[in-house]
């Protein structure tokens, strides 16, 4: 924010308007305009001061998962997926409950064949423990440490849990999962901020699949006064300075005249 304010101040000193473009993608935050950065952007923008944010390039990654809770079904259960090409299996998951609602979160080891919880960590919860560091036991099929921290955001009155997972190895028939519980009539949302992370249900009943909803980045336009910019396919080939013509892979970007598949 200091850099943006510097640009605005200089523009004002020379009597000119100013537009600042930012591309600092992150999915840590509530994605509702109430984060500290979003509030700061909203306050700085105004006549002659425009902020433009990149929506992000995660439109093809299921880094979000959410659920509306009902009577008799007050938990969101999901599994963490890791890219096979990823050298280190890391997950940075930001979990948010509804305004004024309690929240309880625990990490689990799941039998990938049956969808059954085999091992679980102690929980962090609104009226209980707020910090947990847990190592899954020997024989669980998972060599991993999980850390969780819970806090209530004073601005939006929503409870947040930040979960960090670092796995050295995961057996083929095991998955690391998250179980989040709150009140009926409320919602839970999660975002995986790791570059190679996503959510899945493993094809098992009772578990929730990840999706690409709510994937416009925290710094890309969820603030009230920020203009969001995504990617749109205007051409399907380009010519290099050497005269070589290259085509665009439609499997990666989509068809001409459409929103790019990767655009959040």
Describe the role of every protein-language-model region.
Residues 1-264:
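Loop-rich non-cytosolic ectodomains and luminal regions
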């Amino acid at each position: 924010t200091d850099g943006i304010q510097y640009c605005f101040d200089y523009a004002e000193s020379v009597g000119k308007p100013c537009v600042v473009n930012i591309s600092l993608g992150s999915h840590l935050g509530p994605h509702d305009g109430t984060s500290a950065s979003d509030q700061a952007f909203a306050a700085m923008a105004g006549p002659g001061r425009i902020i433009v944010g990149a929506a992000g390039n995660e439109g093809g990654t299921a880094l979000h998962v959410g659920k509306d809770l009902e009577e008799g079904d007050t938990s969101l259960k999901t599994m963490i997926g890791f890219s096979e090409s990823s050298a280190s299996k890391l997950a940075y998951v930001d979990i948010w409950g509804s305004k004024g609602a309690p929240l309880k979160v625990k990490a689990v080891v799941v039998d990938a064949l049956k969808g059954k919880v085999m091992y679980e960590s102690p929980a962090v919860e609104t009226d209980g423990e707020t910090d947990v560091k847990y190592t899954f036991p020997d024989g669980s099929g998972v060599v991993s440490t999980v850390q969780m921290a819970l806090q209530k955001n004073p601005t939006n009155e929503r409870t947040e849990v930040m979960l960090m997972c670092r796995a050295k190895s995961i057996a083929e028939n095991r998955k690391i999962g998250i179980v989040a519980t709150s009140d009926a009539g409320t919602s839970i949302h999660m975002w995986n901020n790791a570059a190679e992370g996503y959510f899945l249900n493993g094809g098992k009943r009772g578990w929730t699949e990840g999706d690409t909803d709510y994937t416009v980045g925290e710094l890309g336009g969820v603030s009230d006064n920020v203009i969001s910019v995504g990617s749109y396919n205007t051409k399907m080939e380009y010519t290099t300075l050497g005269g070589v013509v290259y085509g665009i892979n439609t499997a990666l970007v989509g068809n001409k005249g459409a929103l790019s598949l990767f655009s959040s």
